[in-house]
Amino acid sequence: MSITTAQEQQFYDSAYAVHLHVSDDALRTNRESMLRDLNQPSGAFYERRKLYSAVLAELLSQPLTGQVVLDYGCGVGEWGVLMATEGAQATLLDLSPVAIEVGLRRAAANGVAHLVRGCARDASDLSCFSDGEFDLVYASAALHHTLKYPNALAELLRVLRPGGRLVLAETYGNNPVLNGLRRLRWRLSRQPDDAGEDIILGDRELDMLRNHFSRLDVTPMNLFAMAKRVFRARFESGAVRTTMGVLDAMDRRLLQLAPSLGRYCGEVLVVAEK
């Protein structure tokens, strides 16, 4: 099922609209709340806790005070506002105007409205930003949506300053079994957002990025542990968490013995320096 920019925007506007009506308390976002959500089985981030824990460590590995950062494909703005609470000047970018509205409200709820601005547009035209405007660009599960847009990668590279840092938290697309299951799920779901995810970040895309960065580090994770998708919304079960612990241990051991199998993992953290 093909998808247009308008269809994708409409889908996400609808998906994010529920956040327009939550309380300010529900929008509290800082380092402590993020750590709590990552370790709370009922939390939205728990399924990807390994990936997002690595993201959090990377984002906080250097002082953010005074840094100019872009939350690229920000969704409802958790990461951009988090960086603002650490002292960054944050810009939220998303195709969905509703997402930007929620993100700016989140910024106000956390007392950092003066450090956060929003821009609603598709990634093929970032003319709202100047060349080399950002010290850091972070994209959480966003690049596989935007690469289908003409000029999206060139625009991302343009707005990141020389020496700037790109951090990507992404689905990893080298495993034919996982890719087949993903595509089956997309066809069954009949949802335009899933149909729009037709470029999954894999070795080809990473090689393309390497041509533009002086350094690019890739940390794959979750091979057997991608079975977590089967247990979605059931992580409060002790038996499920025990099973996931066993799968995580299997992954650690196998990837120690055969690091080359990392390319078949289901998720990846990419850190690059321009």
How should each PLM-predicted stretch be described?
Residues 1-64, 167-190:
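Conserved class I S-adenosyl-L-methionine
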Residues 70, 76-125:
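Class I SAM-dependent methyltransferase SAM/SAH-binding core
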Residues 124-136:
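A short acidic, Gly/Pro-enriched loop at the edge of an enzyme's catalytic core
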Residues 150-162:
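A short glycine-rich, Lys/Arg-flanked "PGG" loop and its adjoining helix->strand segment in the class I
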Residues 197-218:
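Short alpha-helix
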